[in-house]
Amino acid sequence: IGHSYTDDRFAQNWLGARAAGIFRAAYHVLRPDHDPVAQIDRFASVVGEAGDLPHVLDVELTGEQPDRVIRERTLACLRELEGRFGRKPLVYTADWFWTPHIGAQPGVADYDLWVAHYYWPTVQEPKVPAGWSTWRLWQHSNRGQVAGIPARVDLDFFGGTMEELIAYAGGDPNPPPPPGIEPRVRNLERWAGELDAWARGQGYDGVRPTGIG
């Protein structure tokens, strides 16, 4: 989502991701040459709700503006996003842009960093922009391949465990078992026992088929 552009499949993908159980967040591409409040007004009208993950401010354009304006409007957009959705947004950027144009600003480390630095594994650790000491997400490639998607895609690492990612998205990393799970487990145990008895009758010794070294 940008100052005047929205992916024509955004609404479809937004609803589809929820239906598929995929953690969701939307990102706004900052235009430093436009009013920050108007930009976030438009973003909020398109997205309409908070995501599972924090929404994202994509900071990598100058808009042919001086660094002072880029800094001011970046920080203003971050404040606006937090005010609209009740959660500090992620900052998506790269050292090559952030450090020379914005630099180490007071309080910026309060916003989690989604850093872009290609290409892992040649690059073992991303270069973190001024103002942060660590990252929450690392976009390590823009040439990835994912089953079911013919085009190249971006790939990312999360700086934590799966349980920490679930908690970050507001979920319970240790949810209770779904209703009716115990009868299904008992059925699986019974079927496994029947399969084991049959396999042992065919010469299986519990480790490998007889005669195979």
Locate each region found by the language model.
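Sec/Tat-exported extracytoplasmic proteins
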Residues: 18-21, 47, 51, 82-85, ...
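Catalytic domains of cell-wall/extracellular-matrix polysaccharide-remodeling enzymes
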Residues: 53-128
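Catalytic cores of transferase enzymes with a strong primary signal for eukaryotic protein kinases
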Residues: 28, 44-47, 58, 86-90, ...
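Short, solvent-exposed mixed-charge patches
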Residues: 212-213
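Amphipathic alpha-helical oligomerization/assembly segments
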Residues: 177-208
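Substrate-binding cleft of extracellular glycoside hydrolase catalytic domains
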Residues: 1-87
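Functionally critical loop-and-helix segments that line ligand-binding/catalytic clefts
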Residues: 104-180
